[in-house]
Amino acid sequence: QGLLPPGEEGTDSPAVVDDIDGEPFINDDGSGYIFWRRRNAGRLSADRLHLDGEPVTLATARQGYSEGPVMFKRKGIYYYIYTLSGHQNYVNAYMMSRESPLTGFVKPEGNDIFLFSSPENQVWGPGHGNMFYDEGTDEYIFLYLEYGDGGTTRQVYANRMEFNDDGTIKTLIPDMRGVGYLAASQETRPNLALQSHFYASSEKSPRTSVVNIETQPNQPLPEKGSVKSYTRTHTYQATHVADESNGTRWMAADTDSSPFITVDLKEIRKVGECQL
């Protein structure tokens, strides 16, 4: 269902809220809502062009600056996802309501922080994300960004979200396996790129990061006993574009004003399909 009524998609109007991370939500009855940073939310007018009434601030179990909200509904339960902290300690927590998109939210039973860093899988600071779902199959995919090397990394990750019988969200362990089209390839044809030479205008220098990560954000140990130090090095070689890994990438040098990359197949080859 579109956010605006049919025929009004191109309407030029002021921003509904003068802020960032606006998250629209359309309820089952067609009523519209919008959520934005700092736990703010409001009901939308019928034309979706302004707020209907005063905004509210949603109360959450955890305090601290928050942005990147997500709202969705599953089996009669409204889920409000909000972020906390940042960089390598970025996490996603949630609240549940059986009343409405703006009222009745309570802390779920068990762990309310469902997504956080996985040093074992080399994913640091899974932050601002959003939901794709198919109500017909009850399949929910959570997409998010990784902020472990600062706010400009923004590598996109995706994992399936699963639920317990009571509707609570199971802890989601971030990884680089991907889902759907980006999951482990079942392709049996040879990847010609793996046998090719790659030439790039430049390559960004390797970057080594040393960070302290809270490994138990739901129940931290006293005196930072669950905070551990981790080190990793990112490289940005041209060959990364074809290594069939979701966790690597090529990046040109910061001083490269006209970046390009060339793949040399070394001989005339028949290419069956290109995937970008």
Regions found by a protein language model. Give the residues of each.
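Beta-rich carbohydrate-recognition and catalytic domains
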Residues: 1-63, 73-78, 83-120, 135-137, ...
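Beta-propeller and closely related beta-sheet repeat lectin domains
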Residues: 20-23, 67-70, 127-130
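Disordered, acidic Ser/Thr/Pro-rich linker "stalks" and the adjacent N-terminal cap
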Residues: 180-268
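A short beta-strand element within beta-rich, extracytoplasmic domains
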Residues: 269-276
